């Protein structure tokens, strides 16, 4: 379901497995941010970034065969030699962009559309092209 520029899943689409896996994924992203802080300079990600990751249903952007891995902290194939990026990388890229609600973002390489969906509630407009 698309609501206000953000792809969201209705409550019925969020299975118990998805919710539990998402909670684990968000913990893992926070741990990864902390453990890579000396390299990246980002020991934690903004609450706003983490909240968007919590709301955007990654399982909507992966194939039926990969539903069980939708909230694994790893890239997944989406066909045509492309992948949906690792969630930590999506969070990191979003964090370092340091966007706000006045920004217009042009994304080159839409892929699954997940990164654009993550950016959408944080900025004024996202334009994306494959």
Sequence positions of predicted segments:
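Conserved alpha-helix/loop element of class I SAM-dependent methyltransferases that forms part
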Residues: 27, 31-37, 49, 70-74, ...
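Conserved nucleotide-cofactor-binding alpha/beta core module
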Residues: 96-130
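N-terminal auxiliary segments of SAM/dcSAM-dependent transferases
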Residues: 1-65
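Conserved short-loop catalytic and cofactor-binding motifs
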Residues: 13, 41, 78-81, 107, ...
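A short alpha-helix capping/helix-coil boundary motif
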Residues: 4-5, 73, 94, 121
